[in-house]
Amino acid sequence: RYRGFDGVVIACVNFEDPEVIELIESNLPVVTIDRVFPNRISIASDNKKGITDLVSYIIKKGHTKIAYIHGRDSAVTRQRLTGFREVMRQHDIVVPQEYIRETDYRDIQRTAIATAELLKLPDPPTCILFPDDYAAYGGINAIKAAGLRIPEDVSVAGYDGISLATKIEPKMTTIKQDTKTMGMLAAEKLIALIEKPSTTEITSVTVPGILLPGATVTSQ
């Protein structure tokens, strides 16, 4: 037991934090969300497929000049970057190095700066992918500050499918992570791990996201 708990679901934390690592390495039943550890059950969004579906949709809309502002290095970021590069390569689309920018997840200010830099390129992108829906608002503000319209002048897409993204106009093109299913699976796995530790399989479960076409990606 840990502070009176029989088990813990770990999500939305810094997985490099020493206290988190100590908990993961303890004897307590643990299930992690969106991070895989040896000998631990994990529930993760299928980030590679999610970004692949999103970029494929954008390409079908006629875009080839697609920039990607991604989050800091992590397993999630690496999966999404791999998916992005693979689908672009499958369509024989060369991605200029200056089209790839790094920022922090949920960082509106840094995302706005990265977006402004992309817009100032001699050959700017026609569509910009953001690390998440929240950070996307920084990019949207930068696009509007440049006197450009979404999606008429620049198309944009986010990731996560937060409720606000579906309520603003135009509605955000994004991938909705199935957090409800992920939470339910995490709870089910943790209960099984607590009640039947010797027979519960230690495995990693991936949950597909859902493409929300929205209205921020226009046809070229």
Annotate the PLM regions.
Residues 4, 27, 62, 92, ...:
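Conserved functional loop/turn residues at catalytic and ligand-binding sites
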Residues 18, 43-53, 69-114, 129-137, ...:
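Hinge/beta->alpha junction and helix N-cap segments in small-molecule ligand-binding domains
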Residues 1-56, 60, 119-120:
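Alpha-helical recognition/docking segments in bacterial nutrient-uptake
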Residues 28-31, 95, 150:
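Hydrophobic beta-strand scaffold residues
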Residues 24, 89, 144:
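Anion (oxyanion) recognition and catalysis
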Residues 116-220:
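Flexible loop/turn connectors
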Residues 6, 63-65, 126:
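Short acidic/polar active-site loop segments enriched in Thr and Asp
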